[in-house]
Amino acid sequence: MTRNIGLKVKEPKRECEDKNCPFHGELAIRGKLFDGKVTGSKAKQTITLQKDAPVYFNKFKRYARGKSSIHAHVPGCIDVESGDNVLTAECRPISKSVSYVVVEVRS
């Protein structure tokens, strides 16, 4: 049985026993949502995302490409590979560098 997490996303088909899953565990979603591209998925239940955002330089009156990398937790009920576009949501800190959780795989 899946929990309503308050977002209009597709629920995963499988169930998991992960306590840090927003659908089947006790993890609450709060704060920011963003799309990102998975650049690394070698760690256990953790991925690295690249977030692209334009940065405005007032001196030149132009935008430049800005990039930042963020670590996110992957619940056991969601399959993610490198190169996928995913939707992540902010949550409480799971570890030192992980404060986001994957909610949906977009492609």
Curated annotation (Swiss-Prot):
The keyword Hydrolase does not apply. It comes from the Archaea. Gene3D superfamilies: 2.40.50.1000. One of its GO terms (cellular component) is cytosolic small ribosomal subunit. Transmembrane segments: none annotated. GO terms for molecular function: rRNA binding; structural constituent of ribosome. Pfam families: Ribosomal_S17. One of its GO terms (biological process) is translation. InterPro entries: NA-bd_OB-fold (IPR012340), Ribosomal_uS17 (IPR000266), Ribosomal_uS17_arc/euk (IPR028333), Ribosomal_uS17_archaeal (IPR019978). Keywords: Ribonucleoprotein, Ribosomal protein, RNA-binding, rRNA-binding. Belongs to the universal ribosomal protein uS17 family. One of the primary rRNA binding proteins, it binds specifically to the 5'-end of 16S ribosomal RNA. Part of the 30S ribosomal subunit. This is Small ribosomal subunit protein uS17.
